């Protein structure tokens, strides 16, 4: 071997020695499996190109509230990508995430959004068109349990907000409306993907209250000949949020790559992947490209209608809150 060959061999050997093998754990909520399977591959390629290091991202999925509890109880997540800010706040309250986490990334650390829609069987046999149709006698509703599922809490508050707007902001009438809706719920799964499987795979229920991305996935991937989406007249702006888990990344020395992993969600490639997986992108150019996918509807926010997640959680989903009250048969 000539001296150039020897030199190249040594250079390649030294490069491989210097390259790190890094593992991250992303603890996420229920229906983000497909999104992060694609995104993880893209980020790994990006990080390899930028640094030469190999990064493998493992995923964990479940109801957002249950996932937050697992991180509180010690699972070593480098990042969390959860359904709502309250679940990240709960981890921060235990000291595992900085309490100012929501200010660390743009758009209140919510790189994409969604909303709540209805999935019905082809032909819409029960003629479901808006929230008021879900309380009619004989309509079987599928939604997850708000005690464990972030998506279910968005579902619940979307229904409550609709009822407020149609009853002069009367809270008692809104509670009666949501109680009537939940009387029609046939199965309460622990997470959003479980509810989708109940409706799609097991054939139970007339209507699934769902994340928009789940409804689009079900129709586009599982058969437009079997299901159709009903977009209600109004719904809630759902903002899934993300954060590094400070205590874990400091311990594992993965802070730089974990932060880059979340920041890359805001990049054009990250936003494109979000849109392809039926999440509403924040990036204006990407949003324009996919505007035909996402119908326009009146959206209200958690802050406008419920005073933010801390107040909403206490009022509706804490022990003895409105969900417990309406659940008493």
Can you name each region flagged by the protein language model?
Residues 116-124, 239-256, 273-277:
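A bilobed periplasmic-binding-protein/Venus flytrap-type ligand-binding module shared by bacterial periplasmic
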Residues 166-233:
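Ligand-binding pocket segment of bilobal, Venus flytrap-like solute-binding proteins
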Residues 91-106, 217-231:
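Ligand-binding "clamshell"
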Residues 249-329:
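Extracellular/periplasmic juxtamembrane helices and adjacent flexible linkers that interface
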Residues 19-94, 104-105, 211:
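Early extracytoplasmic/lumenal segment of secretory-pathway proteins
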Residues 1-7:
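Bacterial N-terminal signal peptides that target proteins for export
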Residues 14-16:
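N-terminal signal peptide c-region/cleavage motif recognized by signal peptidases
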Residues 92-165:
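A conserved helix-loop-strand patch within extracytoplasmic ligand-binding domains
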